[in-house]
Swiss-Prot record:
GO biological process: cell division; cell wall organization; peptidoglycan biosynthetic process; regulation of cell shape
Record flagged with keyword Cell wall biogenesis/degradation: yes
Catalytic activity: UDP-N-acetyl-alpha-D-muramoyl-L-alanine + D-glutamate + ATP = UDP-N-acetyl-alpha-D-muramoyl-L-alanyl-D-glutamate + ADP + phosphate + H(+)
Pathway note: Cell wall biogenesis; peptidoglycan biosynthesis
Naturally occurring in which organism (per UniProt): Neisseria meningitidis serogroup B (strain ATCC BAA-335 / MC58)
GO cellular component: cytoplasm
Main location class: cytoplasm
Keywords from the UniProt entry: ATP-binding, Cell cycle, Cell division, Cell shape, Cell wall biogenesis/degradation, Cytoplasm, Ligase, Nucleotide-binding, Peptidoglycan synthesis
Residues reported in the UniProt entry to bind ATP: 117-123
NCBIfam families hit by this protein: murD
Family: Belongs to the MurCDEF family.
Record-linked InterPro entries: Mur-like_cat_sf, Mur_ligase_C, Mur_ligase_C_dom_sf, Mur_ligase_cen, MurD
Protein name: UDP-N-acetylmuramoylalanine--D-glutamate ligase
The keyword Electron transport is annotated on this UniProt entry: no
Length: 445
């Protein structure tokens, strides 16, 4: 792919957008920058990084009318809007940073492990990266997990990697056509981002774009959407919490197995919850697909401590355990967190619902939750969706109030779980900030 003298508009000026500007300018493109809202201080900051960079703001259509060949989109901007559709119909090309990286790794023949799914993808990406590093591979961990892929490539100064471990969101996959992972997984599909997609099937089809090429597919046998993603003629590794598969959990003994062979007992896995047993199986399958030793992988699984804000115990007071799952930003994540915990629960839900249907939480909560505490802008919708199933629900003005009220009702042996099933931006700067407030409220008890 050549960009010499191509006129390219980079839309969205966060970390991904900045990395695309740097990469494209280095490769000879004539680059301009666009954001719907641009504050003078941001223009000044970016302008110091890139001499002579032209900025556009306001309507995207007005910017695109300036004769651009390519529109490079940051993940937060959907290409499903009339201005972009018209740009494509007039011969313009739309791509993102993953498509740019695909061109690089394809030319170098770097191995790629690609990971997506509604829930668990950050944990699995981190675990796969950790296992690859522990097994001695020169490993790059990038993508939706935090470091933009082109920033990671820039830092390596063009040096070939043994393996790229990429966390990819559905947004990043929308305009990715050339990535051919050595091994890839869709961990699961549940309602998320339905404010951006037509329906759940549309969302699942976007996720399935991760399986372009002929690499190994690692698929969740318990998920109907994932089962439908199997491609003819491809090597597939199935994992399951429900029945025998290539990788599966024997519930009676708590053993993870590969076929008939014992792999590891769940007690030896630091990650809590049944959903993390599935994450471990997916990670081991992905790593085996690039030739890593199963024996070494299982030893290193025992030392992986997981990530903050994902079903993480933050403390205990008078026998009541407090668990932070602030990263549980959709219904599927919260249902998985609840299913993976055995003790009686008081669950804090709420925030920005992103168009989700919360009724699937009814089955997850009934019989396990002694109380539900609702916060945030979509608390009324959650109450409506859960109404009538016998749950004791309490509306709280703040997260701190929810923590205090839950603790007042809890007994020794109970768990207070923050797993909101919602985004956080109505009340917090992000899920990490929401977690900080939760921890502060716990410490104040």
């Amino acid at each position: 792919m050549t960009f010499q003298n191509k006129k390219i508009l980079v839309a969205g000026l966060g970390g991904t957008g900045i990395s695309m500007i740097a990469y494209l300018r280095k490769n000879g493109a004539e680059v301009a920058a666009y954001d719907a809202e641009l504050k003078p201080e941001r223009v000044s900051q970016i302008g110091k990084m890139f001499d002579g960079l032209v900025f556009y703001t306001g309507r995207l259509k007005d910017a695109l009318d300036n004769g651009f060949d390519i529109l490079a989109l940051s993940p937060g901007i959907s290409e499903r809007q009339p201005d972009i559709e018209a740009f494509k119909q007039n011969g313009g090309r739309v791509l993102g940073d993953i498509e740019l990286l695909a061109d690089i790794v394809n030319r170098r023949d770097d191995k790629v492990i690609a990971i997506t799914g509604s829930n668990g993808k950050t944990t699995v990406t981190s675990l796969v990266g950790y296992l690859c590093i522990k097994c001695g591979l020169d490993t790059v961990i990038a993508g939706n997990i935090g470091t933009p892929v082109l920033e990671a490539e820039w830092q390596r100064e063009g040096k070939k990697a043994d393996v790229w471990v990429l966390e990819l969101s559905s947004f990043q996959l929308e305009n990715t056509e050339s990535l051919r992972p050595t091994a890839a997984t869709v961990l699961n599909i549940s309602e998320d981002h339905l404010d951006r997609y037509d329906d759940l099937l549309d969302y699942a089809h976007t996720k399935a774009k991760i399986f372009r090429g002929d690499g190994v597919q690692v698929l969740n046998a318990d998920d109907a959407f994932c089962r439908a993603m199997k491609r003819a003629g491809r090597e597939v590794k199935w994992f399951s919490l429900e029945h025998e598969a290539d990788f599966w959990l024997e519930r009676e003994t708590g053993r993870l197995k590969q076929g008939n062979e014992d792999l590891i007992v769940t007690q030896d896995i630091p990650l809590q919850g049944l959903h993390n047993a599935a994450n471990v199986m997916a990670a081991v399958a992905l790593c085996e697909a690039i030739g890593l030793s199963r024996e070494a992988l299982l030893e290193h699984v025992k030392t992986f401590q997981g990530l903050p804000h994902r079903v993480e115990k933050i403390g205990e007071k008078n026998g009541v355990v407090f668990i932070d799952d602030s990263k549980g930003t959709n219904v599927g994540a919260t249902a998985a967190a609840i299913a993976g915990l055995q003790n009686p629960l008081f669950v804090i839900l709420g925030g920005m619902g992103k168009g989700q249907d919360f009724t699937p939480l009814r089955d997850a909560l009934v019989g396990k939750a002694k109380g539900v505490f609702l916060i945030g802008v979509d608390a009324p919708q959650i109450r409506r969706d859960l109404d009538g199933c016998g749950l004791n629900m309490t509306d709280c003005a703040t997260l701190g109030e929810a923590v205090q009220t839950a603790y007042a009702q809890a007994e020794a042996g109970d768990i207070v779980l923050l797993s909101p099933a919602c985004a956080s931006f109505d009340m917090f700067k992000g899920y990490a900030h929401r977690s900080e407030v939760f921890i502060e409220a716990f410490k104040a008890l």
